[in-house]
Amino acid sequence: MLSKLVKDHQTHQNKLKEENEVLKKEAIASMGVVTNGLIDSVNTGVACIFANQKKLETEARLLQANTAKFSKQTNQWIHLIENFNNSLKEIGDVENWSKKIESDMHNISDIIEFLYINSNPIQQQPQQQPQQQQQ
């Protein structure tokens, strides 16, 4: 009887071990499925992040190229406007110079006319004066 109890106990223990082993294998297999699912989920997120990072890098390079292009264009515009401004200043200088020359020419003309009138004989002066008054 005792030996039968021991034998039954051992048989029961062996069945429990086998059941535990089967359950352990099932748990490991299901953990593998869960782990693979988690890894796929994480990898999908990582792949999406990686793709977004590549897009950002491409956009950053494009932005940098456009910034350099616009910076160059801006510098060209600044140079062009500076040249235009200098040309306007030169035109203003020429205008002032021409007005000064014109004023000097009027002064010289007035002086020559004055000298001409004063150097003529006194007889011609009365004839000249009425002409000046008409002007």
Curated annotation (Swiss-Prot):
Subcellular location: Mitochondrion intermembrane space; Mitochondrion matrix; Cytoplasm, Cytosol; Lysosome membrane
GO biological process assignments: endosomal transport
InterPro entries: BLOC1S1
Pfam family name, one: GCN5L1
Coiled coil: 1-27
Keyword field: Coiled coil, Cytoplasm, Lysosome, Membrane, Mitochondrion
Subunit structure: Component of the biogenesis of lysosome-related organelles complex 1 (BLOC-1).
Protein name: Biogenesis of lysosome-related organelles complex 1 subunit 1
Organism: Dictyostelium discoideum
